[in-house]
From Swiss-Prot:
Keywords: Cell wall biogenesis/degradation, Endoplasmic reticulum, Membrane, Protein transport, Transmembrane, Transmembrane helix, Transport. The gene is CHS7. This is Chitin synthase export chaperone. GO terms for biological process: cell wall organization; protein folding; protein transport. InterPro entries: Chs7. Pfam families: Chs7 (PF12271). One of its GO terms (molecular function) is unfolded protein binding. Chaperone required for the export of the chitin synthase CHS3 from the endoplasmic reticulum. It is a multi-pass membrane protein.
Length: 361
């Protein structure tokens, strides 16, 4: 890699000079490509941890993604719930891989590193493809949540992931003259260009969806913030990483801030989805207590609701049910009907003897 390399489409020279990407150690000459400035390492026992601040951020991203995933799963009747759930599962998968690769827990010199880096690259491609397809769920080309919708999303994401996995493997291994560590056009397209195209299509599709079908225009702000965070993450990673690294004396670099910006972008995706989907409470089966529970002391068969009745405006004495009796008098605050009002006072002018046998038929 030449010093002060200029940006060139299809080449990682400029990018790997400015940012410590997962694929960079496998590109270029036998020594790989390394950034001119990178964050400090820490040693835990015999293990050296690269990018420690970024690793902590990856863990925080896992926690936030889990929280968002649980919130999405709780909206049982929301449109596109199962599709967006798959997106968050894939994001969690990518973040798990990033922890082991960014930190060099799997050393770059290890013979398994190229395979893990290729799996990571394939997972990133599948993640962005899943986001792109989620952008079309709202147009209802197929009914969301159906086997057709879900299996198309899963199978197509698997196919895209396989392609984005195979190209890095071929590039790292140098299987042909068109794919080698020094000829990286294919990897450049699948690893860098393809994700940007997916985000662009998702943004445009959701803007069209909001403008054409929704009355609420405030959700456009979520989309704008999502796009802004994503663009900021790309620029911080590719353009300003070395500047940041030098300014803070190698404590962090652009990888840290780009990871943070991408996390914010994912949070905006969740915020946007949550804003445009409504929960149908009538058919919701959430983990909360039943929304439509009716705790009516008049229908109680024992002392269970007596306290609620006594604290009401009538102090347990008002509220006519039959013949001027309230719930406590009618049921006698006893289990069952053993002390019914008919048995105690009779019915009308017949008195106690004209009742129904002290509460029994």
């Amino acid at each position: 890699m030449s010093d002060n390399a200029a940006f060139k489409f299809g080449s990682f020279d400029y990018i790997c000079e400015h940012a410590a990407l997962v694929v960079c150690p496998m590109l270029g000459d036998q020594q790989g490509m390394a950034p001119t400035c990178y964050s400090r390492n820490v040693q835990l026992g015999s293990q050296i941890i690269f990018q420690p601040a970024t690793c902590i951020l990856h863990i925080a991203a896992l926690v936030m993604a889990t929280i968002m995933l649980l919130h999405v799963r709780s909206k049982y009747t929301a449109v596109g719930r199962k599709e967006i759930v798959l997106f968050f599962y894939m994001y969690i998968w990518v973040e798990l891989f990033a922890i082991f690769l960014d930190s060099a827990i799997i050393p770059t010199a290890n013979k398994v590193y190229p395979w893990f880096a290729a799996i990571y690259a394939g997972s990133v491609g599948a993640l962005y493809w899943c986001l792109l397809l989620n952008g079309f769920v709202g147009f209802q080309f197929h009914e969301d949540g159906t086997p057709m919708s879900l299996w198309f999303l899963r199978i197509s994401s698997l196919v895209v992931g396989a392609v984005c996995f195979g190209i890095p493997v071929a590039t790292f291994k140098g299987t042909s003259s068109s794919m080698s560590p020094t000829n990286t056009v294919g990897l450049f397209i699948t690893y860098l260009v393809f994700p940007c195209v997916c985000v662009l299509i998702y943004f445009i599709s959701q803007m069209l969806l909001v403008v054409r079908t929704l009355d609420d225009r405030w959700v456009i702000g979520d989309l704008v913030f999502m796009a802004g965070f994503y663009i900021a993450g790309v620029l911080l990673l590719v353009t300003f990483s070395v500047t940041i690294c030098d300014a803070v004396k190698h404590y962090v670099d652009g990888v840290f801030f780009s990871t943070l910006a991408f996390l914010f972008a994912v949070m905006m995706v969740y915020k946007y989805w949550d804003s445009i989907t409504k929960e149908d409470l009538e058919f919701s089966v959430g983990s909360k207590q039943a929304v439509w529970d009716v705790k009516d002391p008049l229908l109680a068969t024992g002392m269970e609701y007596y306290e609620d009745d006594a604290q009401s405006a009538y102090r347990g004495a008002g509220g006519s049910l039959v013949g001027g009796y309230n719930g406590n008098q009618y049921y006698g605050n006893q289990p069952g009907y053993a002390q019914s009002a008919y048995g105690q006072q009779g019915y009308g002018q017949y008195g106690a003897g004209g009742g129904y046998g002290q509460g029994h038929y």
